Amino acid sequence: MVILSLVSCSFSVFSPPISLRLHLPPVTSLCSHGTFPASSTFRSQLQPLLISCLNHREPALTFRCSCLSSPIESGSQIESLFSLFRDIGFIEEETEMILAKNPDIKSTSLDKIGARVASLQSLKINGFPLQGLIAKCPNLLTSEEFDLVISFLVDELEGRLDPELVERLLSVVDTSILLSFNQKVRLLLLHGIPKEKISHVLNKVYLNKLLYQKSVEDIERLISFLEPFGGIGIIARRPVILNSDLDSQLIPRVDFIRNLSGEDDFATGTVLRRLPAILSYSVEHMNGQVEFLKSFAGLTSEQVFKIVHVFPNVISTSKERKLRPRIEFLKECGFDSPGMFKFLSKAPLILALSENNLSHKLGFLVKIGYKHRTKELAFAMGAVTRTSSDNMQRVIGLYLSYGLSFEDILAMSTKHPQVLQYNYTSLEEKLEYLIEYMGREVEELLAFPAFLGYKLDSRIKHRYEEKLKSRGENMSLNKLLTVSAERFSKAADNIEMICL
C-alpha cells in the first residue's frame, strides 16, 4: 500500500537507478491549527504534481513539501490561517487588513504563528487585549526580534509581568530597542530587585524613556551612585528614579542633602530611604524650604537637617499654606527657636497635616479644658498628630464612659499627652483588665496615666500575675510597671527561692 503524506512528501529521481519515495495521506492531514479533509478538489490539485514529478527524470533532482514548516501558500492553508484568526476573535475583513499590514504572515508557517499566539496567551494576554495588540503590531507574529523578548518574559521572568505592561512593551514602534530590554531587566535583578517586584518597578517607570533614553551603562552608573545611600532599595521603593538624569538631577540633589547633613552618608541614606520621593524635588526647591525654616523659625542648618532626618516630608510641605501658619501657632504658644526645634523634632507631623484635621483636634482639646496660646495646648496638639480625629473622639468618649470627667482627662493628658493618641480598642482592653481583673479604681490612672501605654499581655498581665503570688493585690501600678525587666526578674527569682 502506497501512502502519501502532506506532512512529509519527498522523492528523488536518479538515472540510473531511479529511487522513488512516496507517502500517501490518510483521510485528513494535520496543520498547525487543526485538521482539514483531504477533499477531492485537494486530491485533484495534488495529482498533476505527482504525475509531473514522476515523468520528470532530471539527475539528482529532489522535491519536498511540508504543510507545517513551509510558507502558507495553498488555498487550504490560507483558510487555516483565517480560521486561526477567527479563533482569536477577528472577522474576515480584519484579518485581511492585518495581512495587508504585514504580508510576511502569509509566508510564515502556521506552526510559528500558532506558537507566538500561545506565548502571548501564556503571558495572560487574551481576548480583546490580544486582538488589539495584534491589530496594532501585526509584525509581532513574524518578527524575529520579538523571539528573545517573549522567551525572556516567559522563561526567565516566569510570566510575572502584568499583562498591561507586556502590551506596552510589545507595542513599541522601534522593535530594535527591545534587544536591550532583557539586559536592563537582568541588571536590576542582579542588583537585588526580587522577581516578584520587577513588575511593580517596571510599571512605575516611564517605559519608553527607560527603553529609548537609558542605556545599560546609564542604569549601571545610577545604581552605583546610589549604592552608599541604599542603592537598589531606594529604586525599589521609587522606581521612577530610573528615569532621572544622573548628572543633572540625582547627583546635585543627593549632594545638597548630604551637605545639609554635614556629609554624613548614613544620615543622608536614612533620609533617602524614608522618602525616596525627595529626589524628585529640585535643588532650588529644597534650598527654599531650608532657608524658610532658618529665617522664619530661627533654626540653624544643623537643626533643619535633624527635622528633615525624622520627617523628610517637610521638604514637600507648602511654605505658605502649612509651614508659615504652624510656626506662627507655635510662636503664639510661647516657643522660642530652641523650644520650637525640640518640639518639631518630636512632633514634626504638625507641619504637614491639613488645616481641617488640626482644627478638629484643636476643638476636642479646647473642649476638655486646654487653653488657647499655651505650651500645654501645643504639646497636646503634637501628641494627637499621631492619631486620627475619629480615634481621638472615641478615646475621649471611652474615658468618660468609665467615669472620668473632662477635668480628669485634662489632668491625665497634661501629665502624659499620649493618653489621647492610644488606639481605642487596645485602650478599652487595658481599662477592662485594670477594673475587672486587677480590681483597681479608674482614678488610679490620674496618678499614673502611663499605665495605658504598656503592652497588656507581655507587661501588664505578666507582671501582675507574678507579683500576685507574693505581694497580693495592693501594689503600686507605678512600681509594678516601671522597674526594669532585669530587676523585676531578679525580684521574682528571689521571691520564688524564699517560697521554696
From Swiss-Prot:
Keywords tagged on the record: Chloroplast, Plastid, Transcription, Transcription regulation, Transcription termination, Transit peptide
GO molecular function (one): mRNA binding
InterPro entries in the record: MTERF (IPR003690), MTERF_sf (IPR038538)
Presequence range in chain numbering: 1-64
Entry keyword Transcription regulation: yes
A Gene Ontology term for the protein's cellular component: chloroplast nucleoid
Intracellular or extracellular location(s): Plastid, Chloroplast
BP terms from Gene Ontology: photosynthesis; regulation of DNA-templated transcription; termination of mitochondrial transcription
Keyword Transcription regulation: yes
Residue ranges that the Swiss-Prot or TrEMBL entry lists as coiled coil: none
A matching Pfam family: mTERF
Family the entry assigns: Belongs to the mTERF family.
Role this protein plays: Transcription termination factor that is transcriptionally active in chloroplasts.
Protein name: Transcription termination factor MTERF8, chloroplastic
